[in-house]
Each structure stands twice: as structure tokens, then as C-alpha cells.
A protein has these predicted regions:
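Transmembrane-helix motifs of polytopic, lipid-linked glycan transferases
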Residues: 98-128, 168
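Membrane-interface alpha helices of multi-pass inner-membrane proteins
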Residues: 18, 139-144, 191-206, 213-218, ...
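Membrane-embedded, lumen/periplasm-facing catalytic core of multi-pass transferases
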Residues: 420-481, 489, 494, 498, ...
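Multi-pass, polyprenyl lipid-linked donor-dependent membrane glycosyltransferases
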Residues: 34, 98-106, 138-173, 201-213, ...
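Hydrophobic, aromatic-rich transmembrane alpha-helices
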Residues: 221, 320-369, 403-406
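Loop-to-helix entry region of an early transmembrane alpha helix in multi-pass inner-membrane enzymes
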Residues: 70-85, 89-112, 137, 152, ...
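Signature aromatic-anchored transmembrane alpha helix within multi-pass, membrane-resident enzymes
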Residues: 11, 133-137, 197, 213, ...
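Transmembrane alpha-helix segments characteristic
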Residues: 11-18, 137, 143, 199, ...
């Protein structure tokens, strides 16, 4: 492929992906899910001069417990820092739209990197020029239109950005590894430094960057050939017995340690900040995340996750929990949203996973999937693997299109076709995924409109009821949405008994509780019983603008407000 053709192909893929993501972003008018609001809200606070601050205290597992509080006790800051750049230019009036600029650009770049990965795989498989070109461009086109990649290219969180960094790191790993076996005496330090920069920036985006680093370590230590061109008897004997000569060991150490040092150096300032702010250089509640027994444990206040509570479930419950986490990551993240490409890609992955061009991505994908499924089986059901799975979906696209290309070539030989029809594979894939993409974007657009309508109507309704927002922090089941829409301090509602919530309210001086009736949480239904402290929650009826009761069409019909009043 000529340089001109490569630039034209990359430009065409980027343009297609950009248009699709811009349309999707325009359809989403409010940050959903809540973590999206967190990233965009912190970016707004940075632009307004408040620094890395959040008005929502959504987790009680990291000290100090204050509200507003320093942001990113669990997540990483880079998505917010980048979102602050267009926000600083455009202003904070349209803070969410400004934040979407970064996600649209990052999501479009994912498609270009997918094209490059497909082209590398095609070159390694030694496909004819026409089929190779089709596989590369087809991979980029499918990545431009695949529902999950489109959706998270419209939402300013960590997903699209981490996918860009993961794919870039894996592409660079394959190039460094290929040079190790090409006869060159040493890999230039600039490539190793660049890899370290990518790993460090990825670590500032998501904690799953560690699995990228381990994938590179595995490639360096076990996957690289001994230095090409060394045909001495000593080298041949060492190669037969799996022994690394001293010079080889030194080179492998350099390949591993230079990127690791650069990545650690880039992460060091953030680690120091966390140490000074939260008392730990790394996310302090990671261990507790592994001990969750319920999706609501992230909001636990008095009943914190513990090893004793985790083991007390018994073997059957633990097996069921891990099966649920595995099933969520497999079905809800990889197969169903990307159907049928996700399913086909998984089935044919053994056909391509030995390709050196895909090896780093395969290793990182397997490590990420295994750790999130086995160690964080409950936390992953809230998005741990999902937000790190962008690059994994690209891997499945390449595997699926490579299999379709082989199938079409085989059918062509059997049917004696004379015209090239490799384009049928990407065409079939696009025809299959576009309807689901439209449905996915439409669904999240409706959700965003519903959530925005609810939080736009809530302040006026509470003012009419005589309990205006702003008098101290508010306890609520969606603390980030309320904090960012009403610009007030909020506290996450623990899924615990009323007396525990009373302790929380007394500690922070909260006088109001706002909760949605969703049939999933025990709140507010728990107040209908005789639980200790239930009588301290006095419901405040909400009315419409005319003073009448809320009808079924009101965005607040499922919203309940309580005044916390206890002697």
C-alpha cells in the first residue's frame, strides 16, 4: 500500500466515523449514564476554576468523606482534563456539548486504528492486494458503524479514549516486536519511550492499562525470537533449549524496563496527588470492589464490603456470582450489542489469534476479560469491563471480517467466480449492524431526554413543595445527575436500613432525600414497614405547575421526596 493510498484510506474512514458519531452525539442531549456526567461535570469545574472537584459524594469507601470532594478517588482524570479543553474555548453554558467534542474525535480515531489493524492482519495473512485492501477498509468502515463504538464515541467518558490508547499501544508493540526478529541490532529507544508514553497516558485514563503492560511483558519475555542473524553454535544451542544468552537477556530487560519506567514516570504526579489527597497512591478501594456481593455495594455507607461478608455467601453463591459476571462480560458487552459480529468474531478468534499483528491485543483482551470476570464479578456488571472493551470489539471485527473473507474466497473457488467479490464480507457486516446501531442510539437518546426532563422539572417542583434544593447536601439514588444538573452537593443513597441513612444524614447535615421508584432498590418501599428510623422520613408531595397532583405523563411521576426530620 502506497503512502498516498494509506492516507486517503485513513481519511475516508475517519470522515465516515466522524459524521456517524457527530449525528449520534447530537441525538444525546444529556450525560447518560451517570459516569459520563461525572467526567463532564469535573471538566466544567476545572474550567470554572474550582479544580478537580465533584459535588457528588457517590462512594464512601475512600477517605476523607467530604462534600464537595476531590474528584477521582476511583476513576482516572484524563477524560475530564481533555474535555476541559474544548469547554474552555466554547464556555460552560453548553458544557456537555463541549465535552462531547473529545469523545467524537476519539471515537473517530478508533475507526482509523481499526483500519490499520485490519490492514496489518491482511498483510501478515498475505492476502491478494484487492482482498487486503477490502479487509483493512472494511474493518475501519464496520468500526465506524458498530453500535457500541458509535454510542461511546458520543459520550464523554473513558471508553473511546482508552480504546484509542490501547489500540495505539498494541499497534506499536507489534512494530517493535517485528523489528526484534528482522535482524536489526537494537530497537531504537524512541520507540520504547513512545510505548511508555502510551501506557502512561492509558493508565491516566483507565486502571486496565496495567493489562496492556503485562501483555507487552509477556511478549518480550516469551514471545520474541532470539536476536535474528545470530547463527553461532552457542546461539543455536541456547535457542533449542530455551536459554537466553546474556546479551539477549539484557535486550529483553531493556525492552521491558524502558517503557515501564516512562509509564511510571508519567503516572507519578497523579500517584503523588492521590497519596496527598486520599492517603494512597493507587485507587484505595480496588480491593473492596472485588468483595462486592451486590451492585449497590458501591454506595455502601455503614455496611462496607468485607472478606467475611464475601465468604459468608457460601460456595454456591460465589459460583453463581462469578458466572453472572462472566455472562455479563460475554453476552451483554461483546455478543449482544455487537451482534452478529461479536458472536462470529468470538467463534473464529482461534483462526487469527496467532497472528503476530494481533497478539498484543489478544493478550490484553484475554487478561482484561479474565480479571474483570473472575476478580470483579459484581463490579464488572456496572461497567468495569464494558468501558475497557472498545479495543476488544475491534479485535472481534477483524476476526469476523477475516473469516468472512476466507469464506467468500472459498465459495468463489467452488463456484468459479471470476470477479472479485471480497467486498461482500464488509457489506454483509454493515447491513447486519446498522439497524442495531440505530436502535441503540435511539434508545440512549430517549433515556437522555427522560433524565434531562426529570432533573429540569425537579428544582421547581421542590420549590413549590416548600423544600427548595440548596439547603445543604441532598441524599439521592442518582447523586451525580442531581449534582451536575442542579449544581448542589449530593450524597449517594446507600441501599441500607433507614437508621443507617439517618446516620449518614446526621453526619453531613442532610435534610432531604430524593429517590426514584424503580422496583430494584429497597428504597423507598422500606419506609412502609416498621424498620428502625423509618418514621423520621416525612414524604413531601410534589405537584405540577397548577398545584395539582402529578399525572402519568409527568417526568417526576416516579420521584419521591422526603424531609428528614428526627428529634
Amino acid at each position: 500500500m502506497s503512502r498516498r493510498e494509506a492516507w486517503l484510506s485513513a481519511g475516508a474512514v475517519f470522515a465516515l466515523a466522524f459524521v456517524v458519531r457527530a449525528v449520534a452525539a447530537a441525538a444525546v442531549g444529556f450525560p447518560v449514564p451517570e459516569d459520563t456526567a461525572y467526567y463532564a461535570g469535573v471538566a466544567r469545574n476545572v474550567v470554572e476554576g474550582r479544580g478537580l472537584i465533584s459535588d457528588a459524594l457517590w462512594s464512601y469507601q475512600t477517605q476523607p468523606l467530604t462534600v464537595p470532594r476531590a474528584a477521582f478517588e476511583v476513576w482516572m482524570p484524563l477524560p475530564s482534563l481533555l474535555a476541559a479543553l474544548p469547554m474552555a474555548v466554547a464556555g460552560t453554558a453548553n458544557w456537555f456539548r463541549a465535552a462531547q467534542v473529545v469523545s467524537v474525535m476519539a471515537g473517530s480515531t478508533v475507526a482509523v486504528l481499526a483500519w490499520r489493524l485490519g490492514a496489518d492482519a491482511a498483510a501478515e495473512m498475505r492476502l491478494p492486494v484487492g482482498r487486503a485492501r477490502t479487509l483493512g477498509i472494511g474493518t475501519g468502515a464496520v468500526a465506524s458503524l458498530l453500535g457500541p463504538l458509535v454510542m461511546y464515541g458520543a459520550l464523554p467518558d473513558s471508553t473511546a479514549l482508552f480504546a484509542v490508547l490501547a489500540l495505539s499501544a498494541c499497534l506499536l508493540m507489534t512494530r517493535i516486536a517485528s523489528r526484534c526478529g528482522s535482524g536489526e541490532k537494537a530497537i531504537p529507544n524512541r520507540q520504547l519511550v513512545a510505548l511508555g508514553v502510551l501506557l502512561g497516558v492509558a493508565a491516566l485514563t483507565r486502571s486496565e492499562a496495567i493489562w496492556l503492560g503485562l501483555a507487552w511483558l509477556a511478549i518480550v519475555w516469551r514471545g520474541l525470537p532470539s536476536r535474528a542473524g545470530d547463527d553461532s553454535p552457542a546461539a543455536a544451542t541456547a535457542e533449542r533449549h530455551g536459554i537466553q544468552l546474556p546479551t539477549h537477556r539484557f535486550e529483553r530487560l531493556r525492552l521491558a524496563l524502558v517503557p515501564a519506567f516512562v509509564a511510571a514516570l508519567m503516572f507519578l504526579p497523579w500517584a503523588i496527588r492521590n497519596w496527598l489527597t486520599f492517603g494512597s497512591p493507587l485507587p484505595g478501594q480496588t480491593v473492596k470492589n472485588a468483595l462486592y456481593i451486590s451492585n449497590f455495594d458501591v454506595f455502601a455507607y455503614r455496611d462496607q464490603p468485607s472478606l467475611a461478608g464475601y465468604l459468608a455467601q457460601g460456595p454456591a453463591a460465589l459460583i453463581e456470582m462469578h458466572a453472572a459476571g462472566f455472562g455479563h462480560n460475554l453476552l451483554d458487552v461483546l455478543i449482544i450489542p455487537a451482534f452478529p459480529l461479536g458472536l462470529i468474531g468470538l467463534l473464529v478468534l482461534p483462526r487469527v489469534w496467532r497472528l503476530t499483528s494481533l497478539r498484543p491485543l489478544v493478550l490484553a483482551a484475554v487478561l482484561t476479560f479474565a480479571v474483570t470476570s473472575l476478580i470483579f464479578p459484581v463490579a464488572t456488571q456496572s461497567g468495569t469491563f464494558l468501558h475497557a472493551a472498545g479495543a476488544v470489539l475491534v479485535l472481534l471485527i477483524v476476526a469476523c471480517l477475516a473469516a468472512l473473507d476466507a469464506l467468500i474466497a472459498w465459495v468463489g473457488r467452488q463456484r468459479h467466480w471470476t470477479r472479485p467479490v471480497a467486498w461482500l464480507g464488509p457489506a454483509f457486516a454493515i447491513a447486519a449492524i446498522v439497524p442495531l446501531t440505530v436502535v441503540s442510539v435511539s434508545a440512549i437518546s430517549r433515556q437522555a431526554d427522560d433524565v434531562r426532563a426529570r432533573y429540569e422539572a425537579l428544582p421547581a417542583a421542590m420549590a413549590r413543595a416548600g423544600v427548595p434544593l440548596g439547603d445543604g447536601p441532598v441524599i439521592t439514588d442518582f447523586p451525580i445527575w442531581l449534582a451536575e444538573s442542579a449544581r448542589i452537593p449530593t450524597l449517594a443513597l446507600p441501599d441500607e436500613p433507614p437508621d443507617a441513612v439517618l446516620d449518614l444524614a446526621h453526619h453531613f447535615g442532610a435534610k432531604l432525600l430524593v429517590v426514584q421508584v424503580d422496583g430494584v432498590r429497597q428504597w423507598p418501599g422500606i419506609l412502609n414497614g416498621d424498620a428502625s428510623g423509618a418514621g423520621c422520613f416525612k414524604e413531601v408531595p410534589l405537584t405540577d405547575i397548577s398545584g395539582g397532583g402529578l399525572d402519568e405523563g409527568s417526568p417526576l411521576v416516579d420521584t419521591r421526596v422526603f424531609r428528614i426530620d428526627c428529634p
